[in-house]
Regions:
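Active-site histidine-anchored catalytic micro-motif
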Residues: 130-132
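DG-centered beta-turn motif at the end of beta-strands
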Residues: 8-11
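Active-site pocket-lining segments that scaffold enzyme catalytic pockets across diverse folds
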Residues: 135-137
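Terminal accessory/targeting
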Residues: 2-5, 15-127, 139-282
Length: 282
């Protein structure tokens, strides 16, 4: 049996992203999303989650992305830049973390605060993942999985896309190498999660083409979907031009949203006997 979790990241980051995710859920086949508890529009996202109780909701642990922490800046200063925000990306964070400049006590306190903020919102949390996949980095993954067990969140994203998978997406060698490194870290994280009795999808898609998916590329993934539970990570939103002026990632938010509204892809789900599910299917 083929099952697919279509998980929209960055819920709570911006109203146009929130609106795109909900549109993709109500009118398309997005089945799950990941709430950023420290993001500027997280309260709007919580309200939308409460209005759409069948939408799977994960916690998108955030240690990067130039957003503010949940805890006061003075309590987690080793995680932040001079403006009191998280570092811009995983590369900057990894350099600081592996140089020994991040205090483990501050890291754990902030991750706990993010999980607890989501739990206090009274929404059913289906899983844990993270912004730019920092939760699978060696040295952080063990802490995150410990917290999963402690807070009884028994499912986790494992972003282990197959090393050779392209799905028709053409890119440079640098992106391929980056994906390979992440998949290797995710493979180690999967082994650790399995040893702790945590659950995760068997397959993962959407890494190499992250932020650049469209109807054709999603269709290619559906055509090649293996048996079992697969996660497809996506980043839908409304008005790519407006979002592109705010965020530097050059994502194609509108195209990603349209991929799940596309009538051809909806028919493909039926033709391939693919069941849309959320993380509770793991």
């Amino acid at each position: 049996m083929k099952k697919i979790i279509v998980n929209a990241d960055d819920f709570g980051l911006h109203p146009l992203i929130n609106a795109g995710i909900i549109k993709g859920y109500r009118e398309g086949f997005i089945t799950s999303t990941s709430l950023m508890p420290s993001a500027p529009c997280w309260q709007e996202a919580v309200k939308l989650a409460q209005e759409n109780p069948q939408l799977g909701i994960g916690v998108h642990l955030t240690l990067v992305g130039s957003v503010a922490p949940v805890l006061p800046a003075g309590k987690v200063s080793s995680l932040l830049d001079e403006q009191g925000l998280f570092l811009p990306d995983y590369v900057a964070f990894a350099k600081r973390f592996y140089s020994g400049s991040v205090k483990r006590s501050e890291l754990e306190a902030e991750l706990r605060a993010q999980i607890e903020r989501a739990l206090e919102a009274k929404i059913n949390i289906t899983h844990i993942d993270s912004h730019q996949h920092t939760h699978v980095l060696p040295g952080i993954n063990a802490l995150v999985l410990k917290l999963c067990n402690e807070y009884n969140i028994i499912r986790v994203r494992i972003p282990k896309e197959a090393y050779t998978f392209t799905g028709g997406f053409h890119t440079g060698i640098g992106r391929m190498i980056g994906r390979s490194g992440l998949s290797f870290c995710a493979q180690l994280a999967a082994q650790r999660a399995d040893s702790l009795g945590l659950h995760h999808p068997q397959h993962f898609f959407g890494m190499l083409a992250g932020g650049h998916l469209n109807a054709e590329l999603v269709g290619n993934i559906l055509h090649q979907l293996p048996d079992g539970v697969s996660e497809l990570m996506t980043h839908p939103g409304l008005d790519s031009a407006a979002l592109g002026k705010i965020f530097p990632w050059q994502y194609h938010w509108q195209e990603e949203l349209q991929a799940y509204l596309d009538s051809g892809n909806k028919k493909l789900l039926e033709q391939e006997h693919i069941q849309p599910v959320n993380f509770t299917a793991c």
